[in-house]
Amino acid sequence: MIQAIKGVSFHVNEGEVIALIGANGAGKTTILHTVSGLLTPKEGSITFEGQDLVKIPGHKIVSMGMAHVPEGRRVFAQLSVLQNLMMGAYTRKDKEEIAQTLETVFDRFPRLKERQNQMAGTLSGGEQQMLAMGRALMSHPKIILMDEPSMGLSPIFVNEIFDIIQEVSKSGTTVLLVEQNAKKALSIADRAYVLETGKIVLEGKASDLLNND
């Protein structure tokens, strides 16, 4: 069995935007999958809100305040935009608060409001990325994990997506961002970690790393 990551240690402070950058196969997505409970590490711990996530089933991590926007968007193509968004709120019970969150998501993503009854599979790539982000925000997360949000998008959509990530951060949500577009990620991050073959080889303030090429 290939070991994708080894000896990785990093921290994310509340309210930060943290970027994990590196080439394909560096282990970035594996880290996100491990943090969100999709993979179980052989050893080590992942602490969130004072609890070790390794000991908590993945499906319960969402209700603790963590949301994951997967690589490739992974929207439910045969469901409407609205149905996709409501899937993001499945751990929540208060209908009034869910409705308020939905309005906030629609304010942030006007295209989704316009297309709320449209099948998700008919949206453009950029719109599907917005939907995946909106779906994650419907869980009202404390931290949101984003995996390659710029993948396959036109430059215009990339700029729009990164503007929205900054808005999400400013609203108080912590962001852990995996991104191959290093310059774009570093331009909005507070701090960053650079991965090579499953190990962190560089870390520091994003502005310092951006100027360091």
Briefly describe each language-model feature range.
Residues 21-23:
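The feature captures the beta-strand-to-loop junction immediately N-terminal to the Walker
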Residues 36:
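Helix-to-loop junction immediately C-terminal to a conserved catalytic motif
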Residues 44-52, 64, 97-102:
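Conserved ABC transporter NBD signature motif
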Residues 138-142:
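A short, proline-enriched helix->beta-strand linker immediately N-terminal to the Walker B motif
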Residues 119-123, 127:
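Conserved ABC ATPase signature
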Residues 79, 123, 136-137:
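ABC ATPase signature
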